[in-house]
Design a protein with these regions (language model features):
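Pre-Walker A adenine-sensing motif
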Residues: 2-13
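Walker A/P-loop
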Residues: 12-48, 71
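Short glycine-rich substrate-engagement loop in P-loop NTPases that contacts/grips substrate
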Residues: 47-79
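Loop/turn-to-beta-strand initiation segments
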Residues: 80-85, 124-132
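A short beta-strand-to-loop transition that corresponds to the Sensor-1 phosphate-sensing loop
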Residues: 89, 129-138
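A short helix-turn-beta junction within AAA+ P-loop NTPase domains corresponding to the substrate/partner-engaging
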Residues: 143-159
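C-terminal alpha-helical "lid" subdomain
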Residues: 161, 166-264
């Protein structure tokens, strides 16, 4: 869906709408998979968080998009660089009419501008730079923005097999895919969102860094930063022979933390 949407928008007399809204459960890899797919096909990504669209002043919400949009058009004209705008957590942006999102003059300007951009793209002689909107639930988006011709929808709800492949990709530089113990760990925790495993990977890096700080016996902060940087924690992690055991330990630790939060 991602590649078809992007390529289709660059075609002459494109039948594709400007916006593709990808929705699905939180933490299941929508952003990771979208950006990874773009990277695989050499598509430049202009990434924007939904929070960045909540400026304090009128038109603040579209300023960042407009400037980058002009840059993307020029890059395509000069160097044939295909690009896409990815707006993350769009369901939390001011384009939403959810009760939890305050509506302002800025909100009305943004939704109006987005609709106008989609409509103008059909007749513009300029290259069309497509948009991918990511979010958990788009049922509260301003209805005219989502009509046919402006926006397509795609639900991202990976099955267990797909989830396992994505999780393996997160760890592919450290653990072989055919490692049985690692496969067992994933299967045992497959009900957890993909973001859970991404955080496990981050926890492992933090543990390596903590170990290096303790073992260095250095008490100057600047020298500590230089020492840890020069030791390349990523390389250290790859050399760990107990990597799967380390992953299991981090999984158990994070599960305990989650259980503790639920009881509060």
């Amino acid at each position: 869906a991602v590649v078809s949407h992007i390529i289709g928008n660059y075609m002459k007399n494109s039948p594709y709408p400007l916006y593709l809204a990808i929705h699905g459960p939180k933490g299941e890899g929508k952003t990771f998979q979208t950006i990874r797919t773009c990277s695989k096909y050499n598509i430049a990504v202009y990434y924007i968080s939904g929070a960045e669209l909540c400026g304090s002043y009128e038109k603040d919400s579209i300023t960042a998009i407009e400037k980058n949009l002009d840059d993307a058009i020029e890059e395509y004209k000069k160097s044939n660089i295909v690009s896409v705008f990815v707006i993350d957590d769009f369901h939390l942006s001011i384009a939403s009419i959810s009760a939890g999102v305050s509506r302002t003059v800025n909100s009305q300007i943004l939704t109006g501008w987005l609709m106008n951009l989609a409509d103008r793209a059909k007749s513009s002689t300029q290259p069309r730079i497509p948009f991918i909107l990511l979010g958990n639930d788009f049922s509260n988006l301003y209805d005219p923005l989502t009509r046919d011709g402006r926006m397509d929808f795609f639900e991202w709800r990976p099955d267990e097999s797909t989830k396992k492949k994505i999780i393996c990709r997160h760890f592919e530089d450290y653990v072989p895919r055919d490692n049985r113990e690692f496969s067992r760990l994933i299967d045992a925790n497959i009900n957890q969102p993909i973001s859970f495993f991404a955080e496990i990977k981050n926890d492992m890096f933090k543990e390596i860094i903590s170990e290096q700080i303790v073992s260095s016996h250095e008490y100057d902060a600047l020298r500590l930063i230089q020492n840890v940087d020069s030791s390349h924690p990523d390389t250290v992690l790859k050399k760990r022979r107990d990597l799967v055991a380390m992953i299991e330990e981090q999984i158990n630790s994070r599960l305990i933390s989650l259980e503790a939060k639920e009881t509060i």
